[in-house]
């Protein structure tokens, strides 16, 4: 099966796993997905992630994070830039998510980073998704 948009597939799997209250989630691995998982862990949206290999295929395992009253750390995750409609911004145009309560994840010439890091570094790029 060929995926047109692997990032949207990752975000949809995360959303579905949270709605089903699953503790962990397996997705096909790629360098971009590993970088997105790294940012989600740094920002406290997932508890951990690791790359494994099952049946000769690389798999990224995400461990989802829940609070003491079983509320998920991720309330919503949305895809911004899509294959049919790419969204590029300069470092001065990076939007804030929920007034700073959420994050943007961008791909920049300096790698994958949050909107806050991109503003601080002074680089723009493609907005992949918003998480809050």
Language model features by range: what are they?
Residues 1-132:
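Core subunits and conserved enzymes of cellular information-processing
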């Amino acid at each position: 099966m060929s995926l047109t948009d692997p990032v949207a597939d990752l975000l949809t799997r995360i959303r579905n796993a949270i709605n089903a209250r699953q503790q962990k989630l397996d997705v096909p691995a790629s360098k971009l997905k590993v970088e997105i998982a790294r940012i989600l862990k740094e920002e406290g949206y997932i508890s951990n992630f690791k790359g494994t290999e099952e049946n000769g295929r690389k798999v990224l395992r995400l461990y989802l994070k829940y609070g003491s009253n079983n509320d998920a750390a991720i309330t919503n995750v949305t895809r911004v830039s899509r294959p049919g409609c790419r969204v590029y911004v300069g470092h001065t145009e990076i939007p804030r998510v929920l007034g700073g309560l959420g994050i943007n994840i961008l791909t920049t010439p300096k790698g994958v980073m949050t909107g806050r890091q991109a503003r601080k570094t002074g680089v723009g790029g493609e907005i992949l998704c918003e998480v809050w």
